[in-house]
Amino acid sequence: MPPIRVSVERVVAAPPDIVYGILANYRDGHHQAILPPAFSDVEVVAGGVGAGTVVRFSLKLGGRTRRGEARLDEPEPGRILLETVTEGDTQTRFVVEPAAEGCRVRIETELRSSAGPAGIVERLLAPRLLAPLYADELARLNRYARRLVAANQPASPGIA
């Protein structure tokens, strides 16, 4: 079966470098400040900022809690972050692009679906569960980034 793709985007009212810095910082920014409550038990295992960061987490969706571990890469530093779940075939890409109002941020997830009836159910449910989760995350990102800009603070130490 072809992979399942879910993509949500919105304009964030902050400069791209600030927003990218928040997303790349798993110690103080990304997970601490913007993740919806469906994510829990977030633990940075290695790194913490940018490529090489490894994070463990729990995600509760559709009444099920899944534990996972993901590794962060930066295929295009300053523009694209890529989270790859280490057990499974799930990748989530965070794309930050300049826009007149600040920047446009897109969260895109691609995951492999199961074969047969389970795959059909996954194809129906994954977008319905992930899209609202990502919309909430992007709204939280917008609020947090706007607060940082208003306070004239960098996204995190070492990231401009």
Briefly describe each language-model feature range.
Residues 12-14, 61-63, 76, 111-115:
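Beta-strand elements of well-folded, non-transmembrane domains
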Residues 18-20, 31, 65-67, 93-94, ...:
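Short acidic, gly/pro-rich beta-turn/loop elements at beta-sheet edges
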Residues 22, 75, 132:
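Conserved catalytic core of Hanks-type protein kinase domains
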Residues 28, 41-88, 104, 136-160:
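Glycine-rich portal/gate segments that line the openings of hydrophobic small-molecule binding cavities
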